[in-house]
Swiss-Prot record:
It is an enzyme of class 1 (oxidoreductase). GO terms for cellular component: membrane. The gene is CYP76M5. This is Cytochrome P450 76M5. It comes from the Eukaryota. It comes from Oryza sativa subsp. japonica (Rice). Its cofactor is heme.
Length: 501
C-alpha cells in the first residue's frame, strides 16, 4: 500500500474511533432514559473500531448460530460502524416478518454491488418502496414467473432435462462430478427458457468457464469490504473490489447484450421466439421498460437461478446417497408412478417433494438471507429495539434447525414434511421454514425453482441407480459446507450413474 493510502487509512481509523466513542456516549446516556425505550439486543462485547468482526471467522452461518446459542435468538453485533441484529429462531423471525415486514424491507447494499449502477437497477437491491422496484417486480410476476408464462415454455424445460439425463447416460459406469454436470444442464435450461439460447453443452468447458466467471463475480461481491464497514472510505476502494466487480460485470453484461442485440436484429425481420426475452423487448418497445433493465434482469435470472437450483440438486443427491433407505423409498415411489417422468408428475410424488424440502431445510443455498435494513424507528423483536438504519440478518440455516420448531433438527428426515397436519411450502408463511425468504423480499424465482428442482431430481432417480465411487461409503460421504454467498459442499460430490432397465 502506498504512503498516501496509509495516511488516508490512518486518518479514517481516527475518525472511526470518534464515531465509535460517540456511539458509546449516545447509548450510555442520550436524550431519553433507558427505562423509556427497549434495550438493544445482547451480544458479544465489540472491540474498538472493528467491533465483532474477529468473532465471525469460519463458516458464517455456523458461527452466527454458535454465538446465538450464547447470547440468544435476537443478538446484536457491531461490524465496523454498522449495527447488525441477527435473528436465529422461528419465533423471532415470525415477529419480524408479521409485524415489521414493511419497516425491514430495505436492503443493505454492498459497495461492490454499486458497480455499473447495478444496485440502482436491480430488483435484488432496490428498496421495496421505490416505484422502480414495484414495476420490475410486477414485470417478473407477470412475464417471467407467472403460471401461464412458465407453462408456455414447459416443453423447453422438459427437453433440457432429457439432455441432462442423456449426458449422465453417456457417462454410465464412470465417476462424474455431479455439481458440474448439473450446473451445465440447468444453465442451458434457464437460458433456453428465457432467451432461447443454449449457453453451453452439458458438462462442457464453455459452461465451466461461464460458471467460473459468475463465481469470480460472486466472490468479489461477497468478500468482506472495508468500504462497507467504514462507508466514508468508499471513494477510495482500498481493496479494489469495486474495480474488480466492474470488470467482471462488464464481461457478463457483454455476453447478455450480445444476445439481446442479435434478437433485436432478428425481430426487424419478423423473427420471434415467443420466449421471455421477446416479452421483455415488447415492453421496451412500448416504453414500459428500459433496455438496460432487460440486461440486468437476465443477468439476475442467469446468474442466481442456475447456481441456486444446481446447488439444491447437489445437496439433495448427497443426502440421498448418505441415507440409502431414503434413496430406496424415493426410487420406489417413482417406479410405481411413471416409466418416463414429466414435469407435471413431480407434483404427484409426495415423498420426492419431501426429500427436496428436507434437503433445502438442512442445507439452504442461501443460509443467510440477504441483509435487510430497518428504515424506521420503532422496530422491536423479542423485546429488543432494532435501531433505525441497522442491518437485520436472518440466519435461515439456524432458524430451520431451531429445536423449538423441529424434532431431530440435524437429521435428514423427509417424512417430517408428510406427517405434519399443516402443509409446509416454500413461501415463507411458516416461519420455521425459509429457504426462499419471506414477506416482500421472498425470492421471485421461487415458482421456477419449485418446478425444476423436483423434476430434475425425479428424472435422474427414475433413469439411474446412483452409487458412490469405489472406496467411499455412505457413512464416509463428506457433507461439510463452504459458504460465500451460496452454501455449497466443501468437497464436490462425485457419483457413478448406473442405467436402470
Amino acid at each position: 500500500m502506498e504512503t498516501r493510502e496509509l495516511w488516508v487509512l490512518a486518518a479514517a481509523l481516527a475518525v472511526s474511533l470518534l464515531y465509535y466513542l460517540a456511539a458509546l456516549m449516545r447509548y450510555a446516556g442520550g436524550g431519553c432514559s433507558r427505562s423509556s425505550r427497549p434495550p438493544l439486543p445482547p451480544g458479544p462485547t465489540p472491540l474498538p473500531l472493528i467491533g465483532n468482526l474477529l468473532s465471525l471467522r469460519g463458516v458464517l452461518h455456523h458461527r452466527l448460530a454458535s454465538l446465538a446459542r450464547v447470547h440468544g435468538p435476537v443478538m446484536a453485533l457491531r461490524l465496523g460502524l454498522t449495527t447488525a441484529v441477527v435473528v436465529s429462531s422461528r419465533d423471532a423471525a415470525a415477529e419480524a416478518f408479521t409485524k415489521h415486514d414493511r419497516r425491514l424491507a430495505a436492503r443493505v447494499v454492498p459497495d461492490s454491488n454499486r458497480a455499473h449502477g447495478f444496485s440502482d437497477r436491480s430488483i435484488i437491491w432496490l428498496p421495496s418502496s421505490d416505484p422502480r422496484w414495484k414495476a420490475l417486480r410486477g414485470i417478473q410476476a407477470t412475464h417471467l414467473f407467472s403460471p401461464r408464462g412458465l407453462a408456455a415454455v414447459r416443453s423447453v424445460r422438459e427437453s433440457k432435462v432429457r439432455d441432462i439425463v442423456a449426458y449422465f447416460r453417456s457417462r454410465a459406469g464412470e465417476e462424474v462430478v455431479f455439481g458440474e454436470a448439473i450446473y451445465s444442464g440447468v444453465l442451458n435450461l434457464v437460458s433456453s427458457s428465457f432467451f432461447s439460447v443454449n449457453m453451453a453443452g452439458v458438462g462442457s468447458e464453455e459452461a465451466h468457464g461461464l460458471r467460473e466467471l459468475v463465481e469470480d463475480l460472486v466472490e468479489a461481491i461477497a468478500k468482506p469490504n472495508v468500504s462497507d464497514l467504514f462507508p466514508f472510505l468508499r471513494q477510495l476502494d482500498l481493496q479494489g473490489l469495486r474495480r474488480r466487480t466492474e470488470e467482471r460485470m462488464a464481461r457478463a453484461f457483454g455476453i447478455l447484450d450480445g444476445i439481446i442485440d442479435r434478437r433485436l436484429a432478428n425481430r426487424t425481420h419478423g423473427d420471434r421466439h415467443g420466449d421471455f426475452l421477446d416479452a421483455l423487448l415488447d415492453l421496451v418497445s412500448e416504453g414500459k421498460m428500459a433496455r438496460d433493465h432487460v440486461t440486468i434482469m437476465l443477468f439476475e435470472v442467469f446468474g442466481a437461478g442456475s447456481d441456486t437450483m444446481s446447488v439444491s440438486l447437489e445437496w439433495a443427491m448427497a443426502e440421498l446417497l448418505r441415507n440409502p433407505r431414503a434413496m430406496r423409498k424415493a426410487r420406489a415411489e417413482l417406479e410405481d408412478a411413471a416409466a418416463v417422468v414429466e414435469e407435471s408428475d413431480a407434483a404427484r410424488l409426495p415423498y420426492l417433494q419431501a426429500v427436496v424440502k428436507e434437503a433445502m431445510r438442512l442445507h439452504p443455498v442461501g443460509p443467510i438471507l440477504l441483509p435487510h435494513r430497518a428504515v424506521e424507528d420503532g422496530v422491536e423483536i423479542g423485546g429488543y429495539a432494532v435501531p433505525r438504519g441497522a442491518m437485520v440478518i436472518f440466519n435461515a440455516w439456524a432458524i430451520m434447525r431451531d429445536p423449538a420448531a423441529w424434532e431431530r433438527p440435524d437429521e435428514f428426515v423427509p417424512e417430517r414434511f408428510m406427517e405434519t397436519t399443516t402443509a409446509i411450502d416454500f413461501r415463507g408463511k411458516e416461519y420455521e421454514y425459509l429457504p426462499f425468504g419471506s414477506g416482500r423480499r421472498l425470492c421471485p424465482g421461487l415458482p421456477l425453482a419449485e418446478r425444476v428442482v423436483p423434476f430434475v431430481l425425479a428424472s435422474l432417480l427414475r433413469a439411474f441407480e446412483w452409487r458412490l465411487p469405489d472406496g467411499v461409503s455412505a457413512e464416509d460421504l463428506d457433507v461439510s459446507e463452504r459458504f460465500n454467498t451460496a452454501n455449497v459442499l466443501a468437497v464436490p460430490l462425485k457419483v457413478v450413474p448406473v442405467i436402470v432397465n
